[in-house]
Design a protein with these regions (language model features):
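Glycine-rich phosphate-binding loop
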Residues: 101-117
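A conserved short beta-strand within the histidine kinase catalytic ATPase domain
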Residues: 60-67
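Conserved short strand/loop->alpha-helix "switch" segment adjacent to the catalytic nucleotide/phosphoryl-transfer site
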Residues: 21-43, 102-103
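Glycine-rich ATP-binding loops of the HATPase_c
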Residues: 118-124
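Glycine-rich nucleotide-binding loop
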Residues: 83, 126-132, 138
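Glycine-rich/acidic phosphate-handling loop/turn and adjacent ATP-lid/helix
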Residues: 75-105
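Short beta-strand-loop-beta element adjacent to the nucleotide/active-site pocket used for signaling
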Residues: 67-75
Length: 142
């Protein structure tokens, strides 16, 4: 099954993507913790796309494609905005600090995505930036 959502590049629509994704996945997978983590990773990806690719302009669109296969879920977040830094996906760890005043507000999205998903890749093709996230799923009972 493959589903495509297209939203305006507004932070107001990030939660809509999360709710739609959760509703679709709940029909197929009962494990709520995994669903919550996938929803979190996708919402972080969409929010980052809006913030960094389009700089919150509100004039463009973000595409989210969900494909549910036999052994994995594949989610692609696509935009036509500014190309990301090639090294931005390398952030695996969260910022560690004992001083609350030195902790930055942002910068958690990529580490969350990398820790939640089994495979993450980012590339540009035909003027589109594409973030691919894959999560292995247990075999479905018939």
């Amino acid at each position: 099954m493959k589903i495509k959502l297209v939203i305006p590049d507004s932070q107001d629509h990030v939660s809509l993507v999360g709710r739609a994704l959760k509703g679709i996945l709940e029909e197929n997978f009962p494990e709520s913790e995994v669903l919550f983590l996938i929803e979190l990773a996708v919402c972080e990806a969409v929010a980052n796309c809006i913030k960094h690719a389009y700089a919150d302009q509100g004039l463009n669109k973000v595409e989210v494609e969900l494909e549910i296969g036999d052994s994995e879920i594949v989610i692609e977040v696509k935009d036509e905005g500014r190309k990301p830094d090639p090294c931005f996906m390398d952030r695996k760890e969260f910022q560690q600090s004992c001083n609350p005043e030195s902790i930055q507000e942002g910068g958690r999205g990529i580490p969350i995505i990398n820790q939640v998903m089994d495979h993450v890749d980012c590339y540009s093709f035909c003027k589109k930036n594409i973030l691919v996230m894959k999560k292995k799923i247990p075999a479905q009972k018939t």
